[in-house]
Amino acid sequence: MTEKKYIVALDQGTTSSRAVVMDHDANIISVSQREFEQIYPKPGWVEHDPMEIWATQSSTLVEVLAKADISSDQIAAIGITNQRETTILWEKETGKPIYNAIVWQCRRTAEICEHLKRDGLEDYIRSNTGLVIDPYFSGTKVKWILDHVEGSRERARRGELLFGTVDTWLIWKMTQGRVHVTDYTNASRTMLFNIHTLDWDDKMLEVLDIPREMLPEVRRSSEVYGQTNIGGKGGTRIPISGIAGDQQAALFGQLCVKEGMAKNTYGTGCFMLMNTGEKAVKSENGLLTTIACGPTGEVNYALEGAVFMAGASIQWLRDEMKLINDAYDSEYFATKVQNTNGVYVVPAFTGLGAPYWDPYARGAIFGLTRGVNANHIIRATLESIAYQTRDVLEAMQADSGIRLHALRVDGGAVANNFLMQFQSDILGTRVERPEVREVTALGAAYLAGLAVGFWQNLDELQEKAVIEREFRPGIETTERNYRYAGWKKAVKRAMAWEEHDE
């Protein structure tokens, strides 16, 4: 028997599908990535082709093994992490989708959400699903497809159609339709799942008229769900044994498995999650209550805050404003000036996320005087990412009563030392940047490996979580509070911009 030396993580993201091979020391052996098409049928609508998601993801699995010259019988297990909330409906018999995947960013169900609000469901939804009413989550997307594809609701009732988030779709394809499952973290993003009873919520299914027959079975984030024999030489059957939504996988990959530990992922947007242990903390400050993974993949809870514009605002400097040629240049120009010269940039291009949830806010630059140049605006744009992170952290500390000792960070923008130092300055808290930046894939790999005994427990992994650099606050409290007060003033003035005067 060949020694099982590796774990594969499949990381199905919003713009690309990736596969990562790791060894027992959590070193990355090889990576394969394929992008796929973003479909925008109307303004504010976003779709993916589920068959293309599957094609790109399955080919990266074959590629990543070939690249490292590894045969499939050396793989101990496969873990899956995925873009959350994105919704797919398909035929049980043929495996064919009945509609494109409706992506988490898609706003087409805003009207359904308005109806839910008018029907007075906000409190029920917040208390039972942990979420706010927003087109972001899967529930209204499922309803939209059932409303718009003729005969689909009846077919679903007869058990002919299946619903899944991306993890469910991939596993169904990888097991040739034998396994229809999701995990607690992904289920907690559907607005159809009761995070206290850990079961699908009958009232939500009734309100949205979604037949229970089409829903996947919900399982722990770390257990064997089924086997696949796709990819690589040898065609051995490999257990699929870990699933978590991307942000929860990153939280686990950063080993934030104890109450009060938090991470912030700086991608297109920012996602901050704080583990709250075995208690679901109901937010009074505009955050989401969601399910995370405990030390063995069991159910823990987390508070989550989403900032819509982080890396995206640096892309705006590059693509629309033409102030920089490359995202990496932003650090160089930001450090050419001592401060922002009184300027604040509020990047509310698509409204504001947590903790404001104002879809009518718009982007603005405040505090312009004659001495302001391009470098000040670049610096202020970077600083806005750190200010928004503080907004979310303040809400988290208020909700949980926990004072954060250190923030673990990951994602593309953490390579920017200026941003990380300013983040520490404005939070008044240590910021820890890990050696391995692929924490989302790491989380999926850890969950899969723990389930099959590849790793015995998380203690084995603690020593692998090397912090590459720690940033410590370098400004006084009065200065910190003065700057943050300016930010709050700027945000207030950017809010409700789009609301039309009667």
Curated annotation (Swiss-Prot):
Positions with a binding annotation for glycerol: 84-85, 136, 246-247
- Which Pfam families does the entry link to? FGGY_C (PF02782), FGGY_N (PF00370)
Q: Which GO terms describe its biological process?
A: glycerol catabolic process; glycerol metabolic process; glycerol-3-phosphate metabolic process
Q: Where does ADP bind?
A: 14, 18, 268, 311, 412, 416
Q: How is its activity regulated?
A: Activity of this regulatory enzyme is affected by several metabolites. Allosterically and non-competitively inhibited by fructose 1,6-bisphosphate (FBP) and unphosphorylated phosphocarrier protein EIIA-Glc (III-Glc), an integral component of the bacterial phosphotransferase (PTS) system.
Q: What class of enzyme is it?
A: transferase
Identify the InterPro entries for this entry: ATPase_NBD, Carb_kinase_FGGY, Carb_kinase_FGGY_CS, FGGY_C, FGGY_N, Glycerol_kin
Q: In its keyword annotation, does this UniProt entry include Zinc?
A: yes
Q: Which residues bind sn-glycerol 3-phosphate?
A: 14, 84-85, 136, 246
> Which Gene Ontology terms cover its molecular function?
ATP binding; glycerol kinase activity; metal ion binding
Q: What is its EC number?
A: 2.7.1.30
Q: Name one GO cellular component term.
A: cytosol
What is the reaction catalyzed? glycerol + ATP = sn-glycerol 3-phosphate + ADP + H(+)
NCBIfam families listed in its UniProt record: glycerol_kin (TIGR01311), PRK00047.1 (NF000756)
- The protein's assembly and partners: Homotetramer and homodimer (in equilibrium). Heterodimer with EIIA-Glc. Binds 1 zinc ion per glycerol kinase EIIA-Glc dimer. The zinc ion is important for dimerization.
Family statement drawn from the similarity comment of this UniProt entry: Belongs to the FGGY kinase family.
Q: What does this protein do?
A: Key enzyme in the regulation of glycerol uptake and metabolism. Catalyzes the phosphorylation of glycerol to yield sn-glycerol 3-phosphate.
Specify the protein name. Answer: Glycerol kinase
Organism of origin: Escherichia coli O8 (strain IAI1)
Q: Which gene encodes it?
A: glpK
